[in-house]
C-alpha cells in the first residue's frame, strides 16, 4: 500500500492540490496524444477540474483519511504501517501511551519515535520494515523481535523513551520482466518507496532515446547524485542518473 500511495495516489495530484491527472499512464508521448484522437483523453499536464470529477474527490478522501491506513491496533498492540510525521495515542489495558513521530519520509529514512505517558504503560509496539530497505535498523531500550515484516518491541514504556528507526535508501535500478513485450529493455530508478520519473521538462523530448549507463550507475547506485529540490515550495529529492541519449 505504501508504494501505491506514494507513486499512484499522490502522483495524480499536484503539490498544491489544485490540479489532477484523470488518467495516469506510466509513459506519455505528448505529440501522440495531441495528434491521435484516440489518445486525447490522456492529458500531458494536470487539469484544473473535470466535468465528471469522481476521482479527484476520492484522492482527497484517501489523503484526509490516511491515518486509518497508517496504524492498526488490538487490545495490547499498536502497529505502525506508514511513517507519517505526527502523533498517535493508544490506550492499553495499563494506561495511555502517545507516540510522537518525527519523520521526513519518503525522502529520508531516519525516523524518531518519542513516547509520552503520565505513568508506566505496558504493551507491544510494532513497526513495519519496508520491503524496499535491504538493511533496516531499530534502536531502542527494549529487545527487538522481527516477525512477518515487522519489528516488535514489548515491555513497560516510560515517558521520554525513544525508538529510532533507520531505513537506508540506496538508489536502485529495477529491470522489467522481458516476458512483457512492451517493457523490453526498460528499467525503473527507485529510492526508498519512490519510483522516479524522467520528464520532458527536465530532459527534453524523445525520452525513449534515453539510456541509463549501467556501468556508471554502480552496483548500489553510487554513481547517482541525490540532490534536494525545493523548487515548488515543498522539500523533495531529485536524482541525476548517469546516462546518454541514443
Go through each PLM region and give its residues:
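C-terminal beta-rich recognition modules with glycine/proline-rich loops and embedded aromatic residues
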Residues: 2-7, 12-116, 146, 158, ...
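Non-cytosolic beta-sheet module surface loops
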Residues: 103, 115-119, 128-131, 155
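Beta-strand residues in well-ordered beta-sheet regions across diverse protein folds
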Residues: 114, 128, 139, 154, ...
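Solvent-exposed beta-strand/loop surfaces of large extracellular or lumenal domains
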Residues: 133-154, 172-179
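Beta-strand-rich binding/interaction modules
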Residues: 120-140
Amino acid at each position: 500500500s505504501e508504494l501505491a500511495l506514494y507513486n499512484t495516489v499522490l502522483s495524480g495530484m499536484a503539490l498544491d492540490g489544485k490540479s489532477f491527472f484523470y488518467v495516469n499512464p506510466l509513459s506519455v508521448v505528448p505529440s501522440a496524444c495531441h495528434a491521435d484522437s484516440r489518445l486525447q483523453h490522456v492529458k500531458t499536464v494536470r487539469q484544473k477540474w473535470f466535468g465528471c470529477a469522481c476521482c479527484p474527490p476520492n484522492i482527497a478522501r484517501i489523503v484526509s483519511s490516511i491515518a486509518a491506513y497508517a496504524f492498526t491496533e488490538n487490545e495490547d498492540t499498536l502497529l505502525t504501517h506508514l511513517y507519517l510525521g505526527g502523533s498517535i495515542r493508544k490506550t492499553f489495558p495499563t494506561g495511555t501511551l502517545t507516540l510522537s513521530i518525527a519523520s521526513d519520509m519518503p525522502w529520508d529514512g531516519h525516523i524518531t519515535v518519542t513516547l509520552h505517558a503520565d505513568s508506566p504503560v505496558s504493551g507491544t509496539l510494532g513497526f513495519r520494515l519496508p520491503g524496499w530497505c535491504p538493511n533496516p535498523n531499530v534502536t531502542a531500550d527494549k529487545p527487538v523481535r522481527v516477525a512477518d515484516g515487522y519489528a516488535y518491541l514489548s515491555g513497560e514504556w516510560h515517558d521520554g523513551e525513544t525508538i529510532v528507526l533507520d531505513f537506508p535508501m540506496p538508489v536502485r535500478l529495477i529491470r522489467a520482466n522481458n516476458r512483457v513485450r512492451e517493457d523490453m529493455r526498460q528499467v525503473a530508478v527507485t529510492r526508498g518507496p519512490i519510483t522516479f520519473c524522467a520528464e520532458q521538462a527536465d530532459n527534453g523530448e524523445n525520452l525513449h532515446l534515453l539510456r541509463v549507463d549501467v556501468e556508471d550507475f554502480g552496483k548500489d547506485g553510487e554513481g547517482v547524485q541525490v540532490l534536494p529540490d525545493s523548487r515548488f515550495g515543498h522539500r523533495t529529492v531529485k536524482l541525476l542518473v548517469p546516462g546518454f541519449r541514443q
